[in-house]
A protein has these predicted regions:
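Single conserved hydrophobic/aromatic residue that forms the stacking wall/gate
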Residues: 1-7, 12, 217-218
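Structured secondary-structure scaffolds
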Residues: 16-18, 36-217
C-alpha cells in the first residue's frame, strides 16, 4: 500500500458510483441524456482526491494463474470468463482510502483518510471467524469458505478479495458463486430504488411453491 498525492498520477481521478460504492472504467461508462452511468444503471460522479493505493497490478499474473489452476473458483462459467477477461485487460492499482467521507475506520497512520469500504468490509469474512487467531474453532471450521454473491459485486469478491488475501499470505475462498438479480420492469429490485415486490402478497395470491419456482428460474 502506498500514498498517492493530489495532482500526481497516483491520486484518484475517476468516475464513481455512489450507489455501488465502486469506480468505473472508461469503457464501461454509458452516456444517456447528458449524464454518465455504469452498466447497471447507477449515475456516476467525478472524484478527484488524495488516496492510499493497494498495488493490485502486482497481483494480475498471480490471479490469472490462480483462476487457471482452479477452473471452478468462479461459477457459473459466464461470470468466470467475465472476471478473467477483466483481469487480462490490465489491472490498475486500487484506491483503498478516501478523504471526503465523514465517517468510517481511520487509516491508522493518517487520520485524514478513511479506509475504503470494500477493504474493511471484505475482511469481515475472516475477522468474524476470530482472525488473526487462525487456530480458533471458527476459523478452522469455516475458512476458506464459499461466497454466494450478486453479479454486481463479483469483482470485489473474485479479484480484489483474493488479491488482498494473497498479499497477506492467506488462503482465498474455496469458491465464488455469482447469481443474477430479480428485476421489476427491467430494473434490479432494490430497496434504494423503492421497487421491491412484497413476497407475502405473491405467496397469498399464487402459493409458496409457485413463488419459489418463479424466484429460482429468474436468478
Amino acid at each position: 500500500i502506498y500514498r498517492g498525492l493530489v495532482g500526481s498520477e497516483m491520486c484518484i481521478r475517476d468516475r464513481y458510483s455512489v450507489r455501488d460504492e465502486a469506480f468505473v472504467a472508461d469503457n464501461e461508462i454509458v452516456e444517456k441524456n447528458g449524464k454518465k452511468y455504469n452498466s447497471f444503471g447507477s449515475e456516476l460522479s467525478w472524484v478527484e482526491e488524495e488516496s492510499y493505493f493497494f498495488r493490485l497490478s502486482k497481483w494480475q499474473d498471480k490471479l490469472l494463474d490462480f483462476y487457471k489452476n482452479n477452473p471452478y473458483f468462479i461459477v457459473p462459467k459466464s461470470r468466470s470468463n467475465e472476471v478473467i477477461k477483466f483481469v487480462e485487460s490490465g489491472l490498475k492499482d486500487l484506491s483503498v482510502s478516501r478523504t471526503t467521507f465523514k465517517w468510517g475506520i481511520d487509516v491508522p497512520t493518517d487520520e485524514k483518510h478513511i479506509v475504503y469500504v470494500w477493504l474493511d468490509a471484505l475482511t469481515n469474512y475472516i475477522s468474524a471467524l476470530d482472525y488473526p487467531n487462525k487456530n480458533s474453532d471458527l476459523y478452522q471450521k469455516y475458512w476458506p469458505g464459499i461466497h454466494v454473491v450478486g453479479k454486481d459485486i463479483i469483482r470485489f469478491h473474485a479479484i480484489f478479495w483474493p488479491a488482498f488475501l494473497m498479499a497477506a499470505e492467506l488462503d482465498p475462498p474455496k469458491q465464488i458463486v455469482a447469481h443474477g438479480w430479480w428485476t421489476n420492469e427491467g430494473q434490479k429490485i432494490s430497496k434504494s430504488l423503492g421497487n421491491v415486490i412484497d413476497p407475502k402478497e405473491l405467496i397469498d395470491e399464487y402459493g409458496l411453491d409457485s413463488v419459489r419456482y418463479l424466484s429460482l428460474i429468474h436468478i
